[in-house]
């Protein structure tokens, strides 16, 4: 359930950024032309824009390569937030797996009873169970996502509002014009990312997902990439390039985190058995 809320929050942020971005693009029909005032512009967009120009300058004006490298740099900077959240999720899941029979029993009783007093008593029993096992569902939260979102949004708008990008090309496409192949590449990459994330989660999760949650996860695997492709077709190709790079990084990141955690658990179990 918590992961579902986090995915919905991420999708909500993504929609807000893209909708506002599409409005700006409709007004300018090019990269650039966004407002040059405000705290967000001065402390996030402008520094990222300067970084994009600086990196491009190191590679003879290759803004496509600059977008790729800056995206990777930013993803590495926010990586500790992901790692911290990932570890908390795994610890939470492992603790929940231990108390799952008791939790299921309480939830069954909650569904059956209509008495408010009995419901309150069962809820208190659930809270006591959490406290006994040092479980705090609220401690997971979405804070890491909320912290990194302004950073990633800042980079998004920096790519949009850096006019030099529009006049350059990368590989086969112009960065300032929409490109069907690049749009499809971004959509496919996010499908691959979501698909792998779902498979790894199902494989390594300590708590089996209920059928409803599994169905919801499968639906999101298809919805998000379709949305990504549609939006990508209506923006300059510089943005799908950014999304493709970000999606590829997240895919590799997820694989490494999941496999590293699984390997460390196996090592710990073997060490414990030797003792």
UniProtKB/Swiss-Prot annotation:
Lipidated residue numbers (N-palmitoyl cysteine): 19
Alphabetic keyword roster: Cell membrane, Chaperone, Lipoprotein, Membrane, Palmitate, Protein transport, Signal, Transmembrane, Transmembrane helix, Transport
Disruption-associated phenotype: Disruption decreases genetic competence by about 50%, significant loss of expression of ComGC, no effect on sporulation. A double spoIIIJ-yqjG deletion is lethal.
Membrane topology: Multi-pass membrane protein
Lipidation (S-diacylglycerol cysteine): 19
GO CC field: plasma membrane
Membrane-crossing segments per the record: 63-83, 139-159, 172-192, 219-239, 240-260
Region forming the signal peptide: 1-18
Record-stated family: Belongs to the OXA1/ALB3/YidC family. Type 2 subfamily.
Protein name in the entry: Membrane protein insertase MisCB
Native source species: Bacillus subtilis (strain 168)
